[in-house]
Amino acid sequence: MLKKPDYARQPDFFVAYLTDLPLRDQRDVMERPFFSLAKSKRTEPIEYTSPKGDIWVKVFPNTSFGMATIWDADILIWAVSQVVEMMNRGDTDIPRTIRFHPYDLLKAIGRSPKGKEHYDRLRSALDRLTHTAVKTNIRAGGLKKTASFHWLDSWREIVDERTQQSRGMEVTLPDWLYKGILAKGGVLSIHEDYFHLTGGLERWLYKVARKHGGMQEHGFFISLPTLYEKSGSEEPYRNFKIRLRKIAERDELPEYHLVWLADTESGEPSLHMVRRSLLHYTDPAFKWELRRDRRAPKGLRSA
């Protein structure tokens, strides 16, 4: 089992020892099909084109490791949050390589830091992120530009040769993701309960709601066929629709209330996503969110 190191004894090893940060995600990756939504190994690629044909995403899994999953992407959320924290501190030389101890990372993303199996799963996730290939024209700015990258340029673990104990790990973010973090408005806050969502589809739906619903007074409406295409799901549309309706009926996403709308002009159902704090206070789904990265409006702050 890996032990948490005594950082005072390792001054040569920079550790981003920040496990209680407000969470951030890079906004360009939140609504498109960049990750597998299933925990089972996916070896089929994702090929997505927006309805207007102006945006496309292609994701290619490694045959040995499979495609990076939306649970693997928790590591990227943590890394994005670390970079944003450096920016907020006023750091001027922000590296693409982040060094840390796996114990701290596992705690930060809501995983157990106890037991060898959790560290093995972390290493497998890092392998999938390093070997999943992505091509997209997102952020092309109207030009015929294509970005090709992996979710991590590399990762490595530093092990004490004498004790065989881990002194830490490091990951290097790809330039595409790194520039997206540094760009103005390039990140969005993520609710801390996101890591408690167990289903891949629920996790992705939260990201869609956060990206599109935001703080819009009337929320955001999206048709089921459009959601299905954006998800990159391998399951048949009929099964996807059944699962999505059950998720809407449970209505357990952090921050956002889901309403299933069965009768639409197209004949297909749609989903209404609206922020709970914007509902009328008498609505059963209303919930005021007090988050550590946001302050309540003046007059509503607790004494």
Where are each of the predicted segments found?
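Charged, alpha-helix-forming regions
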Residues: 1-303
